[in-house]
Amino acid sequence: AYRFPGEINIIAIGPLTNIANVINKNPNIVKIIKSITIMGGSWFSGGNISPVAEANIYNDPEAAEIVFKSKIPITMIGLDVTHKVFLTASHIKYLASLKNNSGKFLQDISNFYVEFYKETKNMNGCYFHDATAAIAFTNPEYFDFKKGKVFVSQDRLTRGQTVVFESEKFHETFIDDKRGNINIANKVQSKKVINKFLEIAEKYMK
């Protein structure tokens, strides 16, 4: 990061442990990271590992709290949008039909999730969490965002819940905190996200 100050953009698609560790060891690094796009959290959509928590944040809420209050420019791509982007079994079958090994690989690694959603939710496909976050970075115009401050609960019953104070509704003094405002995705043009992924698959997976 120090070789390319202000040029590092991070797309985080798992728990934020490693990023929090770096911040703890070298707090000045927050000044040279350009942005972090986080696949994690939830505003109004509840949780997917508990009634209130999304899995990536739940697995290390202490780390998530460190990252969210770091003042690094952050975009949160949570369940409010990823649960609206659905990769169908037909999409996965199409990927497997592409004349390259990558398409078959994507089918193989998706089968577990397809079976899981079929058994637990009677759905024919799977949510498209991680790739949605990546596309939010490359094509933010597919999303609507609100600004707010995000706090992460570490209490037993609400562990991992992301509590959002929307900037337009809550004055900073009300929450008595100096953390930066975060861009929180609250709407998505899901068809455009899927089509962009398929376009990339067709073009680059060779």
Give, region by region, the residue ranges found by the protein language model:
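Conformational coupling and interaction surfaces
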Residues: 58, 77-206
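Active-site histidine-anchored catalytic micro-motif
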Residues: 1-84, 89
